[in-house]
């Protein structure tokens, strides 16, 4: 009983930050900026963590750690209720292929540039690459337990998602206005936005800026990228196990991220449309709360001084990936459209 009682202060603090972030994310000003509850939760957590948290750090430690680890995994699993496999059919094979090519090329470019050219550490490169190539802050959060990454590196990766994802959200609609006279449809724009923008909330805003139809296509394409998170984490876990075996005959056991497998199972279950709409909305609201609490807890344990020490290289890597998402993402979209139509 004492063990569970020790969780209460930190859990209450994490959930309080999450509740405030969810409320703030619904404000018109925040919606217009495409700032999700996850982003606001980590910002709020960092503000508290670098000011008054030290006064309650000791009694809150266990609950904050629980939020970062257990609530995070539960949140990723429940995230599957936002998806159905029918979503894939809505954009067809071309949407899936575009997402797969953008994800793979962006992550491989991140690894090559980050490690070979910028000399960044492996954890930072993988976290930034995952955030840019898959689904922003949620991907960074989900990758953290597989890597056992440091909180400061996670916070830096999330910061790059916020900076460049927000830039994309404003820039993509402007780019479309400049090229729509070339006959590029709103459906094609939606595919491009969904396959290249970092966060789901940012994809919603970028699509809505053009039309409701573009927004629907962007969101579905984006959610297919989210669905690719599970196989990515399993592949990453297998690669890390093989790498850390050091080439010895006895391979290190693959630490399968079961929460990622459960995420896919939940998405599969959700595809049968068995749950009432009202219950599904309640589950999704709970999921938002759990993920925001995990982000708030992460912010509480992130020190600004450590982020400063990371220097400019993480931003340089993220900016290069941003450029690739514009140019490379555009070429991939155009190439697949030409190939399949």
Curated annotation (Swiss-Prot):
The chain crosses the membrane at residues 7-25, 35-57, 88-110, 125-147, 154-176, 218-240, 253-275, 290-307, 314-336. It is a multi-pass membrane protein. GO terms for cellular component: plasma membrane. Its main location: membrane. Pfam families: Cons_hypoth698. Keywords: Cell membrane, Membrane, Transmembrane, Transmembrane helix. It is found in: Cell membrane. The keyword Membrane applies. Disulfide bonds: none annotated. Belongs to the UPF0324 family. PANTHER family: INNER MEMBRANE PROTEIN YEIH-RELATED (PTHR30106), UPF0324 INNER MEMBRANE PROTEIN YEIH (PTHR30106:SF2). This is UPF0324 membrane protein CV_0763. It comes from Chromobacterium violaceum (strain ATCC 12472 / DSM 30191 / JCM 1249 / CCUG 213 / NBRC 12614 / NCIMB 9131 / NCTC 9757 / MK).
């Amino acid at each position: 009983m004492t063990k569970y009682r020790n969780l209460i202060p930190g859990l209450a603090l994490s959930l309080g930050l999450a509740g405030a972030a969810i409320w703030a994310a619904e404000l018109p000003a925040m919606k217009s900026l495409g700032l999700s509850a996850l982003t606001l939760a980590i910002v709020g957590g960092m503000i508290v963590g670098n000011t008054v948290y030290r006064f309650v750090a000791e009694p809150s430690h266990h609950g904050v750690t629980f939020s970062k680890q257990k609530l995070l995994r539960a949140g990723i699993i429940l995230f599957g209720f936002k998806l159905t496999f029918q979503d894939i059919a809505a954009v067809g094979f071309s949407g899936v292929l575009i997402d797969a090519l953008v994800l793979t090329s962006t992550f491989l470019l991140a690894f090559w540039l980050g490690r070979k050219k910028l000399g960044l550490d492996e954890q930072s490169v993988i976290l930034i690459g995952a955030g840019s190539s898959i689904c922003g802050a949620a991907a960074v959060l989900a990758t953290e337990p597989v890597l056992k990454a440091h909180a400061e590196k996670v916070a830096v990766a999330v910061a790059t998602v916020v900076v460049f994802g927000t830039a994309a959200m404003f820039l993509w609609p402007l780019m479309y206005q400049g090229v729509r006279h070339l006959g590029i449809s709103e459906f094609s724009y939606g595919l491009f936005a969904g396959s290249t923008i970092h966060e789901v909330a940012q994809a919603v805003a970028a699509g809505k800026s053009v039309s409701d139809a573009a927004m629907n296509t962007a969101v579905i394409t984006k959610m297919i990228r989210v669905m690719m998170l599970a196989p990515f984490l399993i592949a990453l876990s297998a690669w890390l196990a093989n790498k850390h075996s050091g080439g010895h005959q006895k391979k290190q056991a693959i630490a399968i991220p079961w929460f990622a497998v459960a995420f896919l199972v939940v998405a599969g279950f959700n595809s049968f449309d068995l749950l009432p709409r009202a219950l599904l909305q309640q589950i999704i609201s709970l999921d938002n709360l759990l993920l925001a609490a995990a982000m708030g807890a992460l912010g509480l344990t992130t020190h600004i001084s450590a982020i400063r020490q990371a220097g400019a290289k993480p931003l340089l890597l993220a900016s290069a990936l941003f450029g690739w998402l514009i140019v490379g993402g555009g070429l991939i979209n155009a190439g697949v459209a030409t190939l399949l139509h």
